[in-house]
Amino acid sequence: MAFLRCEIASESLRMATAVDVILPDQGELSRIKTLYLLHGLTDDCTGWTRYTAVERYARERGIAVVLPEVQRSFYTDMVYGLSYFTYVSEELPAVCRRMFGLGAARKQNYIFGLSMGGYGAMKCALTYPDRYAGAASFSGVSDLRCTIAHRSLSLQETEITAIFGEKKAVPPKDDLFVLAERLSGDAPGIYLSCGEQDGLYAANERFSAHLASLGIAHRFEHWPGAHSWDFWDASLRAALAYFFD
């Protein structure tokens, strides 16, 4: 495997930004599967490689892994800030295909994330279901509207304003429940997990029930666990097995 730490000039962000990439050293890159792996609110693009065995898991399956950096943006095109959703969902895949020759076919592309990144992964997959074969959310912020209303995140008021504007309201385009209702065509495969001692467990139960009520096939797995890297490493293994084995 090759591990690349890159700084790319992003047009949508109007600045240089970090992205880590794990590439197999065998096989034609245009034919392999690519996993976009998203970080959480208090991490950066190095978290997954520092605290899990993602490179080993990628080697075992011969897949590429792309780990972008989005700061504390909640994977949104911020009202007062940068266009991180556009970057992750549109610009970054195009850059990876141009620079590394990764495949563009839906069947080759997957997106996973933890916590804030779990929200981001679901948002990308539900907004653009034709681009991803599968998506996974681990301890995801699935009910963002409720979470923001109850100030259940370690976001400052100024950060919430920067992301969503003065009203601090989550618009429909950023609400996973609404995006699921608007889903048309074939849904990507969906995998959800959450620890039973996690403060986000009830929200993930609600989201799973909502998907079920809409007839959207998915798997929701839960077991004793907290909002922790131990749980996310286990979830990553489970999701990789679900989609790739």
Model regions and ranges:
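Non-catalytic cap/lid and distal C-terminal segments of serine-dependent acyl enzymes
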Residues: 1-245
